[in-house]
Amino acid sequence: MARDKIALIGSGQIGGTLAHLVGLKELGDVVMFDIAEGVPQGKALDIAQSSPVDGFDAHYTGANSYEALDNAKVCIVTAGVPRKPGMSRDDLLSINLKVMEQVGAGIKKYAPDAFVICITNPLDAMVWALQKASGLPAKKVVGMAGVLDSARFRYFLADEFNVSVEDVTAFVLGGHGDTMVPLTKYSTVAGIPLPDLVKMGWTSQARIDEIVDRTRNGGAEIVNLLKTGSAYYAPAASAIAMAESYLRDKKRVLPCAAYLNGEFGVKDMYVGVPVVIGSKGVERIVEIELAGKDREAFDKSVAAVQGLVDACKKIAPDLLGR
């Protein structure tokens, strides 16, 4: 039985980590694409040579032509300019929008049936642009944001309570930026909601608020520490979880930047919400109830994403006609 083909568009730190994880999880063969000659070829060869040690069979190739994407089952897009210290995700908009137009055209031509995961920032605007540029069905194009943000939230909570991360569930909704919405109401430890844990004396509301703020600034914290780059291990692991749910029809409930067309009162926009990912792509949007401060925070986050999308429309008005 032929292995699935996974195309990684962008061969930087995240791309390389993705390629290794695909092999370790035996998800399929890998094509690494990048415009920098030699980089995808070199990384592909390096990772392929780790396979005898790690014990997996997969074929790795590097390419500088979009033709290499031909018939890919999954495309994961990391191409674009990385975030640097002092640079907001929004500052990246103009440069990376052009990249998404080029990548979208390549996917449309060579991998029109693929499930596409976008990681490029500013995420919510870039996945919107990528879907428009590629013309793929919205349910087959998603953004990796909520899985990562929720993982950070879960890690911080597990560390606070000194429990296994496996026993912590948490959802982060909204845009992938400073206005993201970590939902304490729907976050639990062994099924016990965070508000109840506060009442039980396990922690204080002030401490939970600090963890929420740290989650919102999780990416910036790493950028400031690294000084010359941004996070790549956790983002790659998050995208692989999404790809695996699609390839193996696991139907996991994952928070992703998904296309909304009326859900949550939002239309024609990608925003982070819980979705079910299976072999058909986004198979269901989980429209949870939001009220009070949570609803206000979500609406504020949606407004921030809308601002980015509006900026995209001004920069590349031709995207609207696709």
From Swiss-Prot:
GO molecular function: L-lactate dehydrogenase activity; L-malate dehydrogenase (NAD+) activity
Annotated substrate binding sites: 83, 89, 121, 152
Active site: 176
Entry EC no(s): 1.1.1.37
Catalytic activity entry: (S)-malate + NAD(+) = oxaloacetate + NADH + H(+)
A Pfam match: Ldh_1_N
Any single biological process term in GO: lactate metabolic process
Summary of the function given for this chain in its UniProt record: Catalyzes the reversible oxidation of malate to oxaloacetate.
This protein's name: Malate dehydrogenase
Protein source organism: Bradyrhizobium sp. (strain ORS 278)
Chain's gene name: mdh
